[in-house]
Amino acid sequence: MIIYPAIDLKDGACVRLLRGEMSQATVFNTEPADQARLFESQGFEWLHLVDLNGAFEGKPVNGKAVESILGAVTVPVQLGGGIRDLKTIALWLEKGVSRVILGTVALREPELVREARREFPGKVAVGIDAREGYVAVAGWAETSTIKALDLALKFEDSGVAAIIYTDINRDGAMGGVNVEATSDLAFHLTTPVIASGAVSSIDDLIALKKEEDTGIQGVICGRALYDGRIDPKTALDLLSSVSVSGTPVTGKAG
């Protein structure tokens, strides 16, 4: 299982939001490239970037910060936020992003996701952010009437690299990741799932690791890494292990 340290960008700085509220932002580093270098030096093999301003405005906003990160590290980077057309996808991939995350357009223009996947195989993930089980878009400002699983199932045969699932009500609140909802989603899909939202302790990582065989391929971790609740080496050792304390992980039926 891969752990993805999160670098959320707002006004050029590395921040964490509380439940997706832009007014509830805590600045952790004013130099995102330095934060990226730190994560790489700690042994992380991927980085997860989000252009928060871009998610709200529907276009890239923190481009300079993203480019500074791409120039500072050698590990692959996945990026979401404000990516809503093929031109923007191509631009970021040309600049060195390894995988783009499509969120709002996955709900509003699912065919664009399929077209992007065909044009950029292995480079496109779908971000599904849910509030009480229903998909939220436009930087979480709007909640739809579509359930997360129903949207995910639309892309089962499209060949997207992963589904990134976030429980908005828990995100940034340190209340513990929603393991049940994440594993249930993964169980019903063949597409790998990456868990996100409120990972607050090693216990959360253990709980997710035990459900790895349902299809949970990775986990995004933010605030808990920044404030020291999760030790990088401990987390990396845990998630690279075959099982947790000898406890077999559960498997998919059939």
From Swiss-Prot:
Enzyme Commission number(s): 5.3.1.16
Major location (coarse): cytoplasm
Reactions mediated catalytically: 1-(5-phospho-beta-D-ribosyl)-5-[(5-phospho-beta-D-ribosylamino)methylideneamino]imidazole-4-carboxamide = 5-[(5-phospho-1-deoxy-D-ribulos-1-ylimino)methylamino]-1-(5-phospho-beta-D-ribosyl)imidazole-4-carboxamide
Recorded metabolic or biological pathway in which this protein acts: Amino-acid biosynthesis; L-histidine biosynthesis; L-histidine from 5-phospho-alpha-D-ribose 1-diphosphate: step 4/9
GO biological process, one term: L-tryptophan biosynthetic process
Record carries keyword Isomerase: yes
Entry GO CC: cytoplasm
Protein name listed in UniProt: 1-(5-phosphoribosyl)-5-[(5-phosphoribosylamino)methylideneamino] imidazole-4-carboxamide isomerase
Organism, scientific name: Azospirillum brasilense
Classification lineage: Bacteria, Pseudomonadati, Pseudomonadota, Alphaproteobacteria, Rhodospirillales
